Amino acid sequence: ITAIVAEPRLGAYLKPEGEVAEGADMPAYERGDKVVPYRIIDRMKGADLVGIHYDQLMPWVKPTEKLDDYASEQVKAYAAAHPDKVFTGENGKDRFVEMTSAAFVVIPGDYVTTEDGTGIVHTASTFGADDAKVCRDAGVPGLYLVNKQGETRPMVDLLGKYYAIEDLDAHFIDRCVDKAAYGHHAGDYVKNAYDPRFNEGGKWDKEASEKAEDLNIVISLEMKMEGTAYKIEKFTHNYPHCWRTDKPILYYPLDSWFIRDTLDKERMVELNKTINWQPSSTGTGR
């Protein structure tokens, strides 16, 4: 296989004694060998990699954007240049564009370092402000599902499980979903903490859910067997949890309302003074 890694991170994955000189025969590798033979075939700057496309590691769903008043100019331009990728939802009115050829490409990001990992990070525009910004600037589409109401939604629903196929738009399924690959885990909970098996009677059995194998492990092993994961390890790292339930938080791209209250600021301050705050400091200085 051919792999890419930031040079300062090479030693974290491969041992110096495993390097094979140019022109020398590559030794055979057997599962369990302590040393992995490798050869450095080229050295490049990160900027040299920008624009290179790669295969989608989990090709369950093709990247799709909605064509509406909120679509970016880049999405509209892509749709105009690729009319064969545009389709209408089963409701007959909502329009979408499949954008696989604009995705799965190396893009630059100033928040990536060579201090951890490989110096190359996976970027998902629907899960984080940094990711969203660099993807938007580079014209990389999001990875959404389309439900029967014609709405774009993340692959995981608000209950914490992959959307069931029957809840998705039929035209979107035909154009953008590998039903066999996606259906393998459709309906599965991504975190055991949200699985009803560990929440009987409305009470979360934290100990049982943390002991049981969860979907992250299952998918990691599947990728290893398919040859799309080079190495799988367990790492202890910080992860945000809900302060009320102590359950791991799930990230979602959500529809949000933003209220412009500055127009009524003076009236709000005036009304605030009529409230008997206890303690009084609660109603001031904010």
Language model features: what each stretch is:
Residues I1-R286:
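Non-cofactor substrate-recognition interfaces
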